[in-house]
A protein has these predicted regions:
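RNase H-like nuclease fold core
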Residues: 1-49, 73-143
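Hydrophobic "anchor" residues on beta-strands that sit immediately upstream
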Residues: 29, 58-61
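Mobile genetic element proteins and their domesticated derivatives, centered on retroelements
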Residues: 30-33, 65, 270, 276, ...
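A short alpha->loop->secondary-structure connector
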Residues: 45-59
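Short, conserved secondary-structure transition motifs
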Residues: 65-75
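Catalytic-core elements of nucleic-acid end-processing and repair enzymes
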Residues: 83, 87, 95-98, 102, ...
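C-terminal domain-tail junction helix/linker
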Residues: 203-209, 213, 219, 223-227, ...
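Short amphipathic alpha-helical "interface-anchor" segments enriched in bulky aromatics
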Residues: 261-287, 291
Length: 354
């Protein structure tokens, strides 16, 4: 969650992105959007590593942006439905008005039927697209709707079912992303890391199931009686896991760490965008100095929720600073910069006097 790079570049070409990634020799996994320049830069780094015999760099497409694009298309289709529906209602009112006035309503009636046919067809297209995206979106999750761990085989079957329903030019970008290998990199990594965490298949499956059940428990703020067995299912399954392996606590911690650290989307980047775009109306020109200032602000800002709550990115990174307060660090930097500027000015004055 630390913001490391914040360089203002002249362009976003593959060469620029490749240069930015060159120094990160220990980087194992990249989650990025489908931008042409960014993907070209990642591909260049992958090829260079392969050529030099270095560890491979895995590349995964960002699920967040795939979902965002799908929602944009759904809004576009719904707006079309809304517009055609309003036109059909206007046409129906014209028919009623003509009949009330004793006029020949056959012409406007034909127009009304045509308008309603278009509106109904658009609505059916929306329903079809919505159903198709619901299937595809489920395939992008770590767990299936039934609680089983997602895998390439099941995800591929779901995408095959969804694609025919995502028809039309509007869906071309989403269809392309769903058929790209990089979209499923997170599943490949997930299963590989889980196998490394617990080699035994049956025990690994039981521990994954336990992790999922623990997250289905009703929240402490739930009001009223709790129906079903969701509040005790994880306890029962915990006994089952203990019977399989009495010393499985260490294995569970490793499995839980893998599942908890599975990254499918670069949502952190979207959080940082909110900081970058802060006061954007006044910051017409985003200079490198202003970018550095915003980066410092982000890295010193405490998380307000989640498992990182109460600590800032620099603290989670393990970076030791005199203070993690943004203003305190900024004042220290200003004092240091002023002292250096005074010393430099004093040196120039002595040189001139001499």
């Amino acid at each position: 969650m630390v913001w490391f790079l914040g360089q203002k570049a002249d362009d976003r070409t593959g060469a620029t992105w490749s240069k930015a990634l060159q120094n990160w020799t220990a980087l194992e996994y990249v989650v990025a959007d489908a931008g042409t320049g960014l993907q070209a830069g990642i591909a260049a780094v992958q090829q260079q590593r392969q050529k030099e015999g270095q560890p491979a760099l895995e590349n995964g497409l960002d699920v967040f942006h795939t979902t965002q694009e799908a929602q944009r298309v759904l809004r576009l289709i719904w707006n079309r439905v809304d517009r055609l529906w309003e036109q059909a209602e206007v046409a129906s009112r014209r028919v009623a008005q003509a009949q009330q006035q004793g006029q020949d309503a056959r012409g406007v009636a034909v127009a009304a039927r045509s308008a309603w046919t278009k509106a109904e067809a658009a609505f059916q297209q929306y329903e079809q697209s919505e159903a198709g995206w619901k299937i595809a979106h489920a395939a992008l999750q770590v767990f299936r709707p039934d609680g089983q761990l997602n895998d390439r085989s099941w995800a591929g079957e779901q995408i095959a079912l969804a694609l025919p329903q995502l028809s039309g030019r509007e869906w071309s970008k989403v269809r392309g992303i769903l058929q790209t290998e990089a979209t499923w990199t997170f599943l490949d990594r997930l299963h590989r890391q889980l196998q490394e965490a617990e080699p035994e298949d049956e025990l690994r499956g039981a521990l994954v199931r336990l992790w999922w059940l623990r997250r289905q428990r009703p929240r402490a703020t739930t009001v009223g009686a709790i129906a079903g067995a969701s509040h005790v299912a994880h306890l029962v399954h915990q006994v089952v896991c203990h019977q399989r392996d009495a010393h499985g606590h260490a294995s569970y911690r490793q499995v839980a760490r893998v599942l908890g650290q599975t990254v499918r989307a670069r949502s952190a980047v979207e959080c940082m965008n909110s900081v970058i775009r802060m006061h954007q109306a006044r910051h017409r020109t985003l200079t490198q100095g202003l970018l550095d200032l915003k980066r410092l602000y982000w890295n010193c800002r405490e998380f307000r929720g989640g498992k990182r709550k109460g600590r800032c990115p620099y603290e989670h990174l393990g970076l030791k600073l005199s203070s993690y307060n943004f203003w305190s660090l900024l004042q220290e930097e200003m004092i240091t910069a002023l002292d250096e500027a005074k010393a430099k000015a004093k040196g120039k004055g002595k040189a001139i006097a001499a």
